[in-house]
A protein has these predicted regions:
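Non-heme Fe(II) oxygenase catalytic core, chiefly the N-lobe of the double-stranded beta-helix
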Residues: 2-239, 245-278
Length: 278
């Protein structure tokens, strides 16, 4: 088996074929996949046949799995390492990067499509990805100098409040206090600077709250222009891997009366962005 890559967008994202992720891949193949993620930031593996065990086994080849979130409801899936991205969470419709609200944020996410809804007037349930490396590169130099030293506070409660959801238990609130992350970070794999934004970012530390919120809004608007965005149209059997350290993503609307079953695993970064090289 050899990895075959076909670029899907002028600046990032690639279809990846020639490998069966349900098998015990040699380390050379895993290294090829890691290098492709560093280059393209988003990889789409079509026509995979994965169950939860094989998806989890492959994810572990790419890094330590992030700890499960505090969750008070009943879980549908057997393995707590999975996030159930099905008909459940409107918060995923906002631009975000996975687990930026954790002290040690997410690194790579792997989302597998077991079942997808039919196209509908409400939408097809695509996922959009924004390349935050290219978005940073396109900023004026004066703006780069302004934002270089800035730190934003991230909280899952802030992003959920934007869609009117505030019903967290005391245990969930205690388990997920606000955290601080760099607004501009350097990717540890390839050394390129990238914006680090999310709907979880509530304000800029040591700035007046209105000024910081407006800056965050302006940067998200800049980073999500069409020239920086790839749209993934799902098919059953697609596994998509994306690098949260240099992308944002969001889910699009779909007919929520239809079954939809997508399951995500996210690996954990090495440290808080504040503890990584600037």
């Amino acid at each position: 088996m050899s990895l075959i890559l076909r670029q899907l967008h002028p600046i990032f994202a690639a279809a990846a074929t020639g490998v069966d992720l349900s098998t015990n891949l040699p380390e050379t193949a895993v290294a090829e996949i890691r290098a492709a993620i560093d280059r393209y930031a988003v990889l789409v593996f079509p026509d995979q046949r994965l169950d939860d065990e094989t998806q989890l086994a492959f994810a572990r080849r790419l890094g330590p799995i992030e700890p499960p979130q505090a969750y008070s409801g009943a879980r549908r899936l057997k393995h707590a390492e999975f996030a159930d991205v099905s008909n459940l969470d409107a918060g995923n419709r906002l631009w975000h990067t996975d687990a930026s609200f954790r002290h040690v944020p997410g690194a790579l996410s792997m989302l597998y499509a077991h079942r997808i809804p039919a196209p509908s007037p409400k939408g097809d349930g695509e996922t959009e990805f924004a390349d935050m490396r290219a978005a940073y590169d396109a900023l004026p130099q004066a703006m780069k100098e302004i934002i270089e030293p800035l730190v934003a506070e991230h909280s899952i409660f802030h992003s959920r409040a934007q869609i009117g959801f505030t019903e967290f238990t005391d245990e969930e609130r205690a388990a997920m206090p606000p955290v601080r992350q760099r607004l501009v970070r350097r990717h540890p794999g390839f050394g390129r600077k990238t914006l680090y934004l999310a709907s979880h970012a509530s304000h800029i530390v040591d700035w007046p709250v209105p000024d910081g919120m407006l800056l965050l809004r302006d940067l998200i608007e800049h980073a999500t222009q069409l020239e920086f965005v790839y749209r993934q149209r799902w098919r059953v059997g697609d596994l998509v891997i994306w690098d949260n350290r240099c992308t944002m993503h969001r889910g699009r609307a779909f007919d929520e009366t239809q079954p939809r079953d997508l399951r995500r695993i996210t690996t954990q970064d090495t440290a808080s962005t504040l503890d990584q090289a600037a």
